[in-house]
Amino acid sequence: MLKNFIQKGKLINSISSSSSFQSSTFLNNNGFNSGAWVGSRFFSLEQLKKKTKNQKLINWVEEQAKLCKPDNIYICDGSEEEFKKFTDDMVKSGTLIKLNSKRPNSFLARSDPSDVARVESRTYICAKTKEDAGPTNNWMDPNQMKQTLKPLFNGSMKGRTMYVMPFSMGPLGSDISHIGVQVTDSPFVVCNMKIMTRMGDKVLNQIKENDDFVPCLHSVGAPLAKGQKDSHWPCNPNKYIVHYPEERSIQSFGSGYGGNALLGKKCFSLRIASSMAKEGGWLAEHMLILSLTNDKGEKKYIAAAFPSACGKTNLAMANSVLPGYKVQVCGDDIAWMTMRNGQLYAINPEFGFFGVAPGTSASSNPNALAAISKNTLFTNVALTPDNDVWWEGLSSPPPTAIDWLGNEWHPNGEGNNTFAAHPNSRFTAPLSQCPSIDPEWNNPTGVPISAVIFGGRRSSTVPLVYQALNWKHGVFMGASTASELTAAAEGTVGTLRHDPFAMLPFCGYNMGDYFAHWLSMEQKAGSNADKLPKIFYVNWFRKNKTSGKFLWPGFGENVRVLKWIFDRCNSTLDTTDGKATQTPIGFVPSNNSIDLNGLEINKSSLKELFSLNKSEWLHDLKSMRQFCQQFGDRLPNEIKNQMDQLENRLNKD
């Protein structure tokens, strides 16, 4: 049924459906048609022209409209009214399920079973040369890729609306922030982007006449014929997620899943931004940002890089078990860092949390539970009989539920899926709703970083925590990061893979050059190099070799390790403070330097947590050498030197 949707003085014809605003015309405030014909369809660009003088933006949107042939174009303003309109429409169409009033303004979506995670095998870095993309990225000649994608995008939005979303990665007005514009045919993507980025009119107003922006084209690749019923989760089995680093542009086809479709997230803020950062002398990293305040009121900011689903969100939102210590969060996934007088300052370019649901509970992450108590989009979790959400690890299982595939589910029942919620099921929630949000989280200047932590999921070999001997050694530690695979990426769960800096899926250029860029920060800092962050490595996941049980309780107890890191940031790179012992791999906590007051942990577990097995480390080093061979002459000599030095220290010990 056609109805008028009045929004901020604009009268737009619309139809309630999953694709929203399915009218073939737009009307201006006087009720007259305005716009230009494209083929047999009518598109209005007058609203965009009224809002911006940036001709590059206007031309780009018009080009995408001519290519994708949507039924209409809608310029998103980012308002709450707009969000409500889209979610109401998607509830009516079956794309969303509205949750009960105890979780206000929150919704559940179920994806197509084939569209549940990032698709690394279909993700491309189309640099001008294969060498610039590097051996860890999929590559195709950019012109060839565009020829491949053009027929796929041609008419891909028929029967749908093209939504135009101006968005800012980072606080508006920050010299660290950058602006993008995404067009999409998915209202679900629009609603997620409203939460995850600063999106809408306030951003469009920032794009001046000659400003650059990162253009992001997205289509689910499921055009609708006239009268055709839409899917609750339209997607296409032929998926491409493509980045052009020299052009600073993105194209994504076929997927509606977060990391593939929310192009401000991994695509822009890591793959494209890392390339921009290399050129601009800054860092775009797969890192959380947190602050730790000690019992004397002193605060330090820490950035930490872990692969997906290895505890970034839980650490960023940890509740301290130590009296007088407080953890606050600036971001749980991405950090953009720039140097000022040797000091790295970081912003979180995102505006929301896109967290893994399974395992999130009142005991593991109470702040996350509070953050997702309202205004949240859930994907692929289970639905309880009272219209709330559930996932493994949240609480005791409900007596019955509807699983992520839409089937009836009973705990331990016959014919069940293994999981009620998909292992990579997600929540999208505003950062501002987290009770432990740091007051500086939205500061356009950024926050000063005192420590950088690397870590991964290792069941053996790597101790609970150790510290780099110097900056070069710290870069090597980041480069040697390895982790057991998780459900957030394609592949066999549990398989160990090298994941340097937790950036393997996200580095937008040759990773050998990326290592060199990190090494260059020391020279860039010059005489202020002592202000560079101290570098550490942690492993919460080490297991007892006999029982297979975790040796460290993790979660809030990890603050004990953060306290040691905090104290080491106040010390020089030696052992004079009595809190560290030098070993072949770096500085490890000396006896009794980790605050264990109130923690029940036996001496044998503690000993195993910090044990160093020479043969295991030499095996890891051999694996690292093999991994680095692929970079050829793009591997910095300093990384080779660090491998040699580590081997010498291990053999001397």
Swiss-Prot record:
Transit peptide start-stop: 1-51
UniProt GO molecular function: GTP binding; manganese ion binding; phosphoenolpyruvate carboxykinase (GTP) activity
A Pfam family assignment: PEPCK_GTP
Record-given protein name: Phosphoenolpyruvate carboxykinase [GTP], mitochondrial
Catalytic EC class: lyase
Annotated binding of Mn(2+), by residue: 266, 286, 310, 333
Secretion signal, residue range per the UniProt entry: none
Other comments on record: In eukaryotes there are two isozymes: a cytoplasmic one and a mitochondrial one.
Note on how the cofactor is bound: Binds 1 Mn(2+) ion per subunit.
One Gene Ontology CC term in the entry: cytosol
Any GO BP: response to lipid
HAMAP family, sorted: PEPCK_GTP (MF_00452)
